[in-house]
């Protein structure tokens, strides 16, 4: 009898575990969707039920072999499996309180961010060269693997590098600082080099497939905008560039929603050279315009301080006050500035 109760309890927990996190696309087959249609969805880059539920109907109709009637049926079934309706602010507040935050390696910076880099949203870091953007990314790629009680995310990291600045030896130095095995840390980081804007977007489809297979806590794109500056030039291509960038950022946001990963992107700055620049306190502004400004949940502005110190300012956030914190770039990653 006790054995039977134990088995029932185990069955309950497995059902509960299934209801949390993304559901594999194969679940749609149990809802009466043709296996061939599910395969077509998977080939088009939809690996979870959530991905289908969040997609506009137009996107499904564009898939070869999916008619409007089929798209309607697929979306109806996906909506039954994914809660997408209204909820009370109390429930949402409860969910928000359970959000994991990943430590940056600096206590001052964590205090500024009220715990660290938030999972399930996009954090954008922008600043000139040599302000610590890539160094924070390298440190986060290690700290996201720490246990939750040590400020980690207990998951793997994914690193899309568009500028060729990824250095595994930096990860080893940070791993040593936290007492982690260097080889394990490197095994838990999936790295890809992005060569052009289309390839950069294609990598997100691969990322989605990998996130279904394994638990990832962090997705880094360093830098999200570098390739857009070279692939699209002049004002004539501006609208095409912004549309492509908007699509890329939308996919990032969808990955953050679907898998609850922390998405960290770095952005470059441009100097204002118009007449108004003379009166601006700081004539540098992030590139990507309003599209990237609206897509990022939290925007951090990094600038140089004295020596090895850097200053991080909350540039835009829905819940953090506009404030600054000082941090340092040390041999073992990002840390606190010494007075």
From Swiss-Prot:
UniProt motif (Nuclear export signal) ranges: 245-260
Q: Which residues carry this modification: Phosphothreonine?
A: 13, 309
Q: Which residues carry this modification: Phosphoserine?
A: 14
Q: Which residues carry this modification: Phosphotyrosine?
A: 54
One annotated GO molecular function is: chromatin binding
The modified positions for N-acetylalanine read 2
| Primary localization | nucleus
> What is the protein name for this chain?
DNA repair protein RAD51 homolog 1
Q: What is the lineage of its organism?
A: Eukaryota, Metazoa, Chordata, Craniata, Vertebrata
